[in-house]
Amino acid sequence: TGSMLSTYFIPSTGTNFIERQELGSAANITFSDIPQTYDHLELSVYARSDVSGDVRQYGVYFNGDTTISNYERQTFYATNATVAAYQYSSPVPGIIPGATSTANVFGAQTIIIQNYVLTDRHKSTLILGGYTTRAEIQLSSGRWKNTAAITSIELIVDSPDEFEAGTIVELRGIHSTAPAAASDVAALNSIAPADIEAVN
């Protein structure tokens, strides 16, 4: 009694797939000529390094800018029961397993790049990621100290590393608003006030 279930329709025009890269061999990843028709971008990263080590790092660079001091990051993270935070100049969104980490384990991050086409402000990112064999999760915010619209994104693992084969990175565009189809509007208009009162 008193339980409620709500359902929502999310139009396919709200989030649009731009490009997917799945590596067949070790490499770094670049997205070029990014469309300037969205409000925000989302990177979905499923990655592992090809160099020995339990933990490796990679950077996310915009418009070919690889100057470390042009990026800032604030991170809150938890490893097992230990919680900590730090801030420093870095384009690194998180950690991924190295080649000697547990076999078949990949790290995962979701990176939101907000207002990437606006040219009157620095670019901000929100990052959530981690991987289970290290029992670590990270939540970060980042800033690129540049007002230029973002037209390219590079994901580069710390030298001499590259991403291992099987790494998958997807880029999507996000619209702040999405037009409703005429059929959806008609369906909404067909709801009788009495039915709404009954639900309430």
Residues of each region from the PLM?
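Surface-exposed molecular-recognition determinants
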Residues: 1-200
